[in-house]
Regions:
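Adenine nucleotide-associated cytosolic modules
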Residues: 1-183
Length: 183
């Protein structure tokens, strides 16, 4: 693309992204970011691959069942995009854990972690890219509250956990919805 050119490619190579969650949202997101030439991707997740994940988590296959999501995703990214440095954290992210990325990606499925990532992004003056999906619906947003005065944050948009909120493991999610949100 003429809008990117050499300087744009250099910016992509210099960029660092932290993704919390490597399932149906975080996995494809990481794949597209690595393919775009992002220089460094940090991925956090404590989960293992289960058969029920496969219909929406396209980065995994039958051969990966029972293995750590971050390990398999990192192997795939390293093979397909060796120019991207991948670091993994096989644990659930908590607010006391430092995030190395200049941009934070919330690919989680629970409100406490979403709110904690929102606070981390705001306090550290970083962009927060948020995605969520359940059932037949999904949403994607970018929040710059820590970067621009007056810009709203995730908690401004969703001040408290909705009373009818359910995680996708409770209500299910259609695979193509996660594909649209994660890209």
């Amino acid at each position: 693309l003429k809008e990117i050119g050499g300087p744009g490619v250099q910016k992509l190579r210099a960029a660092s992204i932290s993704i919390v969650g490597s399932g149906a949202l975080g996995g494809p997101c990481a794949m597209f970011l690595a393919a775009a030439g992002i220089g460094q991707i940090e991925i956090w997740d404590d989960d293992v691959i289960e058969r029920s994940n496969l219909q929406r988590q396209i980065q995994f296959g039958e051969r990966d069942l029972g293995k750590a999501k971050v390990d398999i995703l990192a192997e795939r990214l390293a093979t397909d995009h060796p120019g991207t440095r991948i670091s993994t954290r096989r644990k659930k992210w908590s607010p006391s854990d430092p995030l190395s990325g200049s941009i934070l990606v919330d690919a989680t499925d629970n409100f406490p972690t979403r709110y904690a990532l929102n606070a981390a992004a705001h306090l550290s003056e970083r962009l927060l890219v948020h995605g969520a999906a359940a059932g037949w619906t999904g949403q994607a947003s970018v929040f710059a509250s820590g970067c621009r005065d007056g810009a709203p944050c995730y908690r401004c948009w969703v001040p408290e956990t909705p009373p009818n909120a359910a995680a996708c493991d409770e209500v299910g999610v259609v695979g193509p919805v996660t594909g649209m949100v994660s890209t």
